[in-house]
């Protein structure tokens, strides 16, 4: 095929606090030649997720930091436009970890590149409810949360990509599910559309009182994604034997020095009877991904699990859109449309 140009966004400098435009740079380069066993993927949708903020920092973490001048990492969905692989044909739809760019050359042996079917569910959902956020919810609750029917589950960031799925799976498992979200619109969506039993607005004047009213039997499982004041309120109402899977704590991600932040580990550790808690990674359960993928896709296709997307357009504006994750401007899964087919 004729030589094409590829636009990408790289990390230009490490953010101090909230990332700004100058921390990123748009670059244009030639697309590498596709070699035997490789495919060229045209990226159609880009997923923006909170974990990316941690990768921008040089601080020690569960994953290596993004190098300066390296393409920002991300899960994406696209279509194969050139193939020198016996496993992929032109026109195949795939998910991959291309990062913030328009085209990606993938090796056929890359386990993070795999076929998906946009006839079953919309292609963009493979980046959300049927993708990494959905799998995080599935394993975070079923494996880390160890749910028992009749227990009370509290879900932070309940209208978000992960939390919304956690709560809906919780209802399937017979739990009393209470969400925590920001604002009346999101709370109404969580309760009326997603089917949570209750939803507490974390902006409420009396968060402790509102949470206690929603959880009259105390809290058995807390799915942690936020940290801060929300976690402080939840921690006062744990039952003995409670579990708290920690997916993240977005309230601290833009701190100038996260080592000085009061994290869920500090809050839980100070309790007389701390809940069972740990930071988990979805890749801890990689061997079971097929199980989660099958279940989530079927539930979405059958209308048993609902989802919300904020769909925006333009690779060049990805840094701006990324900031929405921390201001609450997005509603549900934040996806950037990169190109038409």
Predicted regions and their residues:
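Glycine-rich beta-strand-centered segment in the early N-terminal region that forms part
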Residues: 30-48, 56-100
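NAD(P)H dinucleotide-binding glycine-rich loop of Rossmann-like/cofactor-binding domains
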Residues: 72-79, 87-157, 304
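Short amphipathic alpha-helix with an adjacent loop that forms part of the alpha/beta core around
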Residues: 206-217
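Glycine-rich phosphate-binding loop and adjacent beta-alpha segment
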Residues: 229-305, 339-341
